Amino acid sequence: MENNFIDYRSFVGMNPEKFYKATLAQSERLMLGLNCLESGQEQKVHDHSGQDKFYFVLEGEGLFTVGDEVKVAGIGMLVWAPATIPHGVKNQTAQRLVILMGIAPAP
């Protein structure tokens, strides 16, 4: 049986080598994940040819790139990256950055 009520805090983790990822929920149509970036870690700019993606900041703040735009987003902010648009994020603060990430259709 699937868990339809998920507390993201039980999935928060860290990896000293690269940013930490955990899958919260997945179907054929959507994947929701948690990305945790320690100070100095980044998800390099990349794109998805047939998938839209969003980031929602749960904790901390990050420097997000979407296309030609580069902006800081903090708690409660949504960052939208349509298919084919290059996107990425870097944690330039001393605090952990925790992001809810969604991608559709699921990989």
Question: Where in the sequence are the language-model features?
Answer:
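Histidine-centered metal-chelating micro-motifs
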Residues: 42-44, 63, 79, 83-89
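A generic "binding-loop/recognition-motif" signal
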Residues: 30, 50, 69, 85, ...
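Well-ordered beta-strand scaffold positions
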Residues: 30, 35, 61, 69-71
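Short acidic-glycine-tyrosine-enriched beta hairpin
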Residues: 69-83
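Ligand-binding loop in jelly-roll beta-barrel domains
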Residues: 83-107
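A short, N-terminal "cap"/entry segment at the start of jelly-roll beta-barrel domains
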Residues: 1-30, 44
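Conserved short histidine dyad/triad with adjacent acidic residue
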Residues: 18, 33-48
